[in-house]
Amino acid sequence: MATLDRVTVPSPVGRTEPHVGIVHFGPGAFHRAHQAAYIDDLLADDPRWGIAAVSMRTRGTIEALAAQDGLYTLAIRDAESAMRVIGAHREFLGPEDARRTHALLADPSVELVTATVTEKGYCLAGDGTLDMNHADIVRDLAGTDAPRSLIGWLVAGLGARKAAGAAPFVPMPCDNLASNGAKLHAALVAFARVRDAALADWIAGEVRVPSTMVDSITPASDAALYDAVEATIGLRDEAAVQRESFAQWVIEDIGQPLGPDLAGAGATITNDVGGYEKAKLRILNGAHSTLAYAGLLRGATSVAEAMRDDALAGFVDAMIRRDIAPMLPKVRGLDIDAYRAAVLQRFRNPVIVHRLDQIAQDGSQKLPYRLGDTLIANRDAGTMPAHVVAAIGCWVAFLIRQARAGTAIVDPAGATLAAIAAEGGPADVVTNLVRQGLGIPAAVAGDASLVAALQTAASDAHDGNWARLFG
């Protein structure tokens, strides 16, 4: 890939240096499109922060990248698309490279260890604490030179640092898990406590784990992407990744250096990651779910298509302005109105095909946080959030449509939801959902006015009475 002359390529400054300063677990598409791009921006001026990527399960991705000297194409997919070659990685390690992974984690020059392993990769129980019965945790606690879990690897690396009298690295979770830093820190201490009480105490007192929030829509790579990359750079790059131009990396200020100057690369360092998380959850995710259920009922299939429905787009905008934004706490450095405008602009991106049926999945788990918290916040403030009520009504109407068409409801409670939605009118369905605490906050059960409003909204959405629902 040294012959790439039709696309932005990494500067040679520092790129010949083999130095590794960051270890990353889980080199999937999001990491390569997001964190690696931030690091790539730093390397020309500071070559200390090359990444060693560790795949704990498979070798497919790392073999493809190693065959290209670690280089791959990042396609920015917006109305004005662009491509660049990322050269942030120095090594690619698989499950059989445990000795090298141990050596890197023990090396004091590695100061940051990041992870994108999905929520499941943290091996947490339903209450957010470490699941001691998880198969990978049980295996790693029994002792092994090649841990299978992220927790096992991090504790092994921190144990090596403590044994050598070296400073710990900074573990940084980068998955969409609320308070991910606090949860990971607690999991590390709990794991270590079983094996070595002194190490557990050292981790509890000396290791700082920042919470983070990451955001950038990253569609799966496909043949269309590979064809577009080939047409641009003249080579077939099947390690290419794509994302929208918007990227956000919010990192908790832990009062000590993280290693690389991530703020200089565009990350936000703050004492209020939770405020950013709440804004994303209620504005971006809440609007996403609203577009999904209302959009599907109105015949749209993607987010961009739903946003071309002027009535629906206007409704979502009004929901954010009137119901959601006033209930959000002030967050230093975050302009809520500018964030709202940016979110809606992102939704209009015609190049990113984000399917509504995917967003509509798992509604009973998502809606209490995406819309339900705003519903209750307004109720507690003495206001009726008509737009949020209407959005939840669209979910109910969607369930009814799916159940009565015999179409599967993709949700952990799918069978129960289908049974509820198959019987009675929309008002009855709302009553039964509230009674069983599915998708609607439990606090609603004791508020007759909210229940009645939800029943009316569900009926309007079911009947297609959009003028009244969106009014």
Q: Could you describe each region identified by the protein language model?
A:
Residues 1-471:
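Substrate/ligand-engaging "lid" and interaction regions
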